[in-house]
């Protein structure tokens, strides 16, 4: 009998759970590759002439029947009226596309507060089943969007899918953390992020024009996530409920033991029960803290502000601008096959997510965050230089492409996973739920801002757009250097002392045993 025994039930349960994480990634990446074909359909539905030569040249329309009939004179003379209509039409399409992308984050932002509540109210398994209803509704709206007002149906569908992902982004890590053996909790916990980046990559591959990313099949590409929702719902009936939920929340010791026996593969689960008993006693001895108290209580103010800044830094780094709009960025950079370059980004993202699993356990959280932000800053400079000088030197397109690949790599080394680790490690059991909720909300809010505004910023700044992100990255790198303490291998008392040095405020101490539960008590 070993603590790190991997059973078939455990593997099956983790894979089933991260199917939700997979959709999270799928919904992030799926909107990228078919951008031009969906925009052309928006124009068709709204009766807006597709007279943008660049748009026509950069996307192959299957037939002239797909476009609204437009008559042109042999010698057209543009009038102020016509120019105003063209500008207004272009602005309308840009707005609708930005909403199509960003509405996903609106849903996530709204639901991020309720994942923990839903899990505690219904249980982890039932909560994921209920969340799948949202996933299926969103998939149906997008899958049938070609039959109606596509822009409205896609925006509504992505909003509802965002609600699902907002719930699942809290439910899946919580469930995996509660079913995993202590020795495997860190490794299995990374499957959530790995499934997300795998979903991004798969959506980019099947979004290729010759697969589903074409005028005939793009709506199937968007609605395909409904299949995953049905599959996961069926598989969840064979998964055990979280033993921690059964024991700590419901006081069902017999059912908790049954669940543990299935997951561990042996009958003597006394050690797990004793650990949960201690955790329940720790939780009951500490008063819950509200979101308002995080900001009004001097003990928590500095940690929550630093936690929020880490999440703001993650999103305002420009990474989701890459994920949402990489095809158009590569197109601007002069890459002849931008969609394939986008798939390359997804592959690099997945590889370095796997690498980060080992780095996070070996190196300090703060160190990795600093390395990641510094590397992204340098890459953003090279991206912008490549775009600015592209007209003079054609080979600069490769500079921009390599810089984007490295940008994503540095993100996954530090700024991608680290904020979630550190927020959990900043706070003990009492304030942690509120801290994680407000951190998730701020993350989704910044995600929405980037998704909505990136296209406008890119249009306004042109090739200089990543100079703007470089400035933001530099500012957050300096903030991290001066304000963020190291948490790896430290107890709450030691982390509190670090914050006290930086702000002069005291943070409530807590026993180091809980840091062991979080996987943060390794020696440096």
UniProtKB/Swiss-Prot annotation:
Homology family: Belongs to the major facilitator superfamily. Sugar transporter (TC 2.A.1.1) family. Glucose transporter subfamily.
Where does the chain bind D-glucose?
193, 314-315, 320, 349, 412, 420
Keywords in alphabetical order: Cell membrane, Disease variant, Glycoprotein, Membrane, Phosphoprotein, Sugar transport, Transmembrane, Transmembrane helix, Transport
Subcellular localization is given as: Cell membrane
Q: PANTHER family from the xrefs?
A: SOLUTE CARRIER FAMILY 2, SOLUTE CARRIER FAMILY 2, FACILITATED GLUCOSE TRANSPORTER MEMBER 2
Q: Which InterPro entries is this protein grouped with?
A: Glc_transpt_2, GLUT, MFS_dom, MFS_sugar_transport-like, MFS_trans_sf, Sugar/inositol_transpt, Sugar_transporter_CS
- Glyco sites are at 62
- Stretches assigned to the Extracellular side: 32-98, 149-158, 209-217, 325-338, 390-400, 455-461
Source species of the chain: Homo sapiens (Human)
The catalytic activity, as recorded, is: D-glucose(out) = D-glucose(in); D-fructose(out) = D-fructose(in); L-dehydroascorbate(out) = L-dehydroascorbate(in); D-galactose(in) = D-galactose(out)
Residue positions of the PTM Phosphothreonine? 523
* Disorder: Fanconi-Bickel syndrome: Rare, well-defined clinical entity, inherited in an autosomal recessive mode and characterized by hepatorenal glycogen accumulation, proximal renal tubular dysfunction, and impaired utilization of glucose and galactose.
Report the protein name in the record. Solute carrier family 2, facilitated glucose transporter member 2
